[in-house]
Amino acid sequence: MELMEGLLTRRSVRKYQDKPIERETMMEIIKAAQYSPTAHNRQPWEFLVIDDREFLAELRHIQRWTSFAKDAACVVIVCGDTEKSFSRSKEDEKWTFIDVDCAIATENLMLAAWARGI
């Protein structure tokens, strides 16, 4: 898939095929997220891949907009580590970049999955 095609055709998916994702494919997708740019190259994230069906069904009790996750082959949770993240204090404000860094990694992850037909 060409980059522009992926950018212009990517969409949010809430209905999933009943088909597992190969471990090698999942590792390639995670690698794409790990190559995302971050503030000062801190890479303040961890990626948790959850494929346990019972746990996925319970996610709806943790986060209210995740009821569709029970039907997914897996869910990747992107966790940001505030200790690793770059931050800057300026006057009376503290600027942190963890949300931006994790959002960029998540977008890379979604585009990599989309490019592989997932």
Where are these regions (language model features)?
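Small-aliphatic-rich amphipathic alpha-helix that forms the alpha element of a beta-alpha
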Residues: 33, 76, 91-118
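Short, conserved acidic/polar surface loops in the N-terminal third of protein domains
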Residues: 86-90
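N-terminal amphipathic, basic helical "cap/leader" segment at the start of enzyme domains
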Residues: 1-74, 80-81, 85
